[in-house]
């Protein structure tokens, strides 16, 4: 069996300097090559200290030659003898040509391996990560397993079960924390070149197989900043094969990726670019467990995915799945800062017959929602996006309680929304009669009275008449809120109604120096 030793590589290439005195001079001093052996323990210890400063773990055992070969369970990886370097079978199906950067290395062997749909490169990466989290050069020796992926397109690229159960491996993934930037930076400067491949960030190869070789799986790649961007670009601009592989790799991890700070972006992208069959599969996974779906909706990242899902669903099957899963969680969603956005999306992007479940629930709980911080938004959205009988029922419920809602910090916005839609003023303003003074002198309800003056010309005379009949009219002029109501009345009224109001205001000319009365007594308003 032919063996290659990284320590004997003759093709020396400069690696990037991380600011540690330029100690990364060539492949001979690359800290990521785990097969380097130093006879001088002091020199090795110094290098370990430098690595630790960079946040890279360093075990002194990797600098010494093992006394006996280390063997991995053949059931997981085949018979591999680890003695100065890994051995690989040159005849392995799907193995690609060794890259130019390793032209001077001896041939590579893997013995008795049968991956059954598992890409040999991710398997190799997993093995390296498990025993030496800083090693990656062996992994770079394999590239472009396109033929292998084509043969196994329906089988996900996955790690060995042996590695998935290895706690040490889980805690030492090469892309965790700050080390991913250092390792990827080292790769860019290691001398490896990909002349005909598109790049991401000007350095790394934008090729699915190459990227999976780095990260180990599409699922893990989606959780990394660089990897996530690369996946989105591949889905949007890559080949059909790339898109299909990414979809098959991610579909089983959609729920957890939806709540991941980075992974949620690739799920959103798939919802947009996938065909109807693939989109139906994603919707089915997300809605299969209603409680899980509600949890995603309440998550800061997950709510974006669900909103995107609602925006992109088109078929009756997809819409039915969304409705049946969201309906039981209405009250939970409407009381949450993330959840209420999902209900708003239902109202905005689903047709009236499909968002009916939201409107009916909003009508039933109208009194509670109107005075709630988030519920008031759902009610306003319901008013804007409903028609016919549903709209009439909702308007009737709000109008019945308009006096109380007008004085509420949140309810006043719901009443103003009704006024903006110019619904019949008969029922809406009926509760306001004999209460205009009370409403005009309050912070929230004063906005409602101003809105009535602007939107309902038929109500202006009645409101002004009630203001003029107030015995302490002078007090209204100096009131921090009522003075705005009087200003608005002077601006919108005409004829005899306005003339009576102007005459009453001029009687209190002594108040024109009052800070609240300055605008009322301005020539512009009084001479209009």
From Swiss-Prot:
InterPro entries: ARM-like, ARM-type_fold, PUM-HD, Pumilio_RNA-bd, Pumilio_RNA-bd_rpt. One of its GO terms (biological process) is regulation of translation. The keyword Repeat applies. Keywords: Cytoplasm, Repeat, RNA-binding, Translation regulation. Pfam families: PUF (PF00806). GO terms for cellular component: cytoplasm. Its main location: cytoplasm. Residues 188-528 form the PUM-HD domain. Pumilio repeats lie at residues 213-248, 249-284, 285-323, 325-360, 361-396, 397-433, 434-465, 466-503. This is Putative pumilio homolog 10. It comes from Arabidopsis thaliana.
């Amino acid at each position: 069996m032919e063996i290659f030793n990284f320590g004997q590589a003759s093709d020396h290439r400069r690696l990037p300097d991380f600011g540690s005195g330029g100690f990364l001079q060539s492949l001979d001093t690359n800290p990521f090559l785990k097969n380097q052996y130093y006879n001088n323990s002091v020199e090795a210890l110094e290098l370990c200290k430098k690595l630790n400063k960079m946040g890279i773990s360093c075990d002194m055992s990797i600098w010494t030659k093992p006394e006996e070969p280390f063997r991995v369970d053949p059931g997981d990886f085949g018979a591999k003898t680890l003695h100065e370097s890994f051995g690989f079978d040159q005849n392995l199906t799907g193995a690609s040509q060794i890259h130019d950067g390793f032209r001077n290395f001896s041939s590579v062997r893997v013995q008795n391996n049968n991956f059954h749909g598992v890409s040999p490169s991710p398997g190799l990466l997993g093995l390296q990560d498990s025993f030496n989290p800083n090693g990656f050069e062996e992994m770079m020796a394999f590239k472009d397993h396109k033929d292998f992926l084509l043969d196994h397109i329906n089988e996900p690229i996955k790690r060995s079960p042996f590695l998935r159960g290895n706690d040490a491996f889980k805690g030492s993934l090469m892309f965790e924390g700050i080390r991913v930037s250092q390792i990827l930076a080292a790769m860019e400067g290691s001398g490896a070149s990909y002349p005909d491949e598109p790049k991401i960030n000007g350095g790394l190869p934008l090729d699915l197989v190459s990227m999976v070789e780095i990260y180990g799986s599409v699922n893990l790649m989606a959780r990394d900043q660089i990897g996530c961007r690369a996946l989105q670009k591949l889905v949007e601009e890559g080949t059909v094969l790339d898109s299909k592989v990414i979809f098959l790799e991610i579909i089983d991890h959609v729920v957890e990726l939806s709540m991941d700070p980075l992974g949620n972006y690739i799920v959103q992208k798939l919802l947009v670019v996938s065909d109807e069959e693939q989109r139906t599969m994603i919707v089915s996974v997300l809605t299969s467990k209603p409680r899980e779906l509600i949890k995603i909706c309440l998550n800061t990242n997950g709510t974006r995915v669900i909103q995107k899902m609602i925006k992109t669903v088109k078929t009756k099957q997809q819409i039915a799945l969304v409705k049946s899963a969201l309906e039981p969680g209405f009250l939970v969603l409407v009381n949450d800062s993330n959840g209420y956005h999902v209900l708003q999306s239902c109202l905005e992007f689903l047709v009236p017959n499909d968002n009916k479940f939201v409107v009916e629930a909003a009508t039933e709980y109208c009194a509670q929602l109107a005075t709630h911080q988030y519920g008031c938004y759902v009610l306003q959205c319901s008013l804007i996006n409903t028609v016919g009988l549903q709209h009439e029922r909702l308007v009737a419920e709000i109008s019945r309680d308009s006096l109380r809602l007008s004085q509420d910090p949140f309810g006043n916005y719901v009443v103003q929304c009704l006024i903006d839609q110019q619904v019949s003023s008969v029922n809406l303003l009926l509760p306001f009669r004999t209460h205009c003074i009370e409403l005009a002198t309050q912070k929230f309800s004063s906005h409602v009275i101003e809105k009535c003056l602007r939107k309902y010309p038929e109500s202006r005379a009645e409101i002004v008449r009630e203001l003029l009949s107030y015995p302490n009219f002078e007090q209204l002029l100096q009131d921090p809120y009522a003075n705005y109501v009087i200003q608005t009345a002077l601006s919108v009224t005409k004829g005899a109604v306005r003339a009576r109001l102007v005459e009453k205001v001029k009687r209190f000319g002594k108040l024109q120096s009052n800070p609240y009365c300055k605008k009322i007594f301005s020539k512009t308003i009084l001479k209009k």
